[in-house]
């Protein structure tokens, strides 16, 4: 017909109720095979477990089960060999596989969908995929944490400026700074592990939404598929995409941490800072400026964070107004997750490589740590400890000392004892013991502090947990 409508239903899986097939536009908007074919392995794995359970419970014959399993394994081989022909008319990965199975083994293929709906089938496939992706992310985060632990250990004594408002605040060590990222990515990994535990329930057997009257064994399929147990409410099971939202939330938080790190890499690799040199492996040049070495990998990690954040908001918006149980809107869940997973994998891998390969310029860090009056807090603390001043008074006295040093264009340690005593008479020569950045760093021995001894304790604690 002129409008692209088939006279017969183009989809024999559900077309019995229809007098004519869908229009070409309907087929285009309805089809998901372009992206959900990524779930082929999970779909086949779930179908094998389902068929095995059906045979075990006497719902289908052992002979049909063996034909189904053999046919599904044949399809798996075809897909992985690149010889399988996907059809948009068959909408999705489930129907593409089932149609091919019917071609391979005949009527026995029609028994596979007994006690099953595409609603619980896709919930299973997608949940399996997200679970596997989370496990992969866990391993990648472990590698990134290991890279930071190595850097922290190498630089437990490397003095650098610590910043607030991107202005020099107090001296810290680069090892301590690296350990801050270990904590961040450690929390990300903990969220990943919690998410795996959260989704460790099998949806298969919930059917369309109400369960099934067949004597199935959902615990059997759950165990076969590596889940802790089956889900407990069939309506919630087919309408739940919390596991996808949780994955995107974790990805978004992790990407935010990666983006903060990327920003520091971009800044620190500039000639103006010069704290680090990126390896050639994670840099690019300019087509016109021969001297340029651009931190493109870090910049792209930073950019991908916006993409991942957008995916989270997109799926939250899809889900926010859906009545129970299943709606076709939920087909829009997968592309957001697939894209974010790919972006996150790339970002973590790139950042792990950058951290392992970067050159730390200790001399530049040390020089910067000594500028900006970074030991002013140490002066104030000395006045509290040694001169007995209340901290607020000590803060004021120190501010006067900074103003004088600023006026003279020198560091605090370059002020004479006479100049300091003119600001406060109780200052003694002992003040100069705390005004070096090394002394400042060494004094920060509180739990979690920047003193090299504390940094090494932090590293040891994480080594035992990574």
From Swiss-Prot:
Q: Which GO terms describe its molecular function?
A: argininosuccinate lyase activity
Q: Which UniProt keywords apply?
A: Amino-acid biosynthesis, Arginine biosynthesis, Cytoplasm, Lyase
Write down the chemical reaction(s) this protein catalyses. 2-(N(omega)-L-arginino)succinate = fumarate + L-arginine
Give the GO terms filed under biological process for this record.
arginine biosynthetic process via ornithine; L-arginine biosynthetic process
Where located?
Answer: Cytoplasm
Name the protein family: Belongs to the lyase 1 family. Argininosuccinate lyase subfamily.
What protein name is recorded for this chain?
Argininosuccinate lyase 1
Q: Which organism is it from?
A: Agrobacterium fabrum (strain C58 / ATCC 33970)
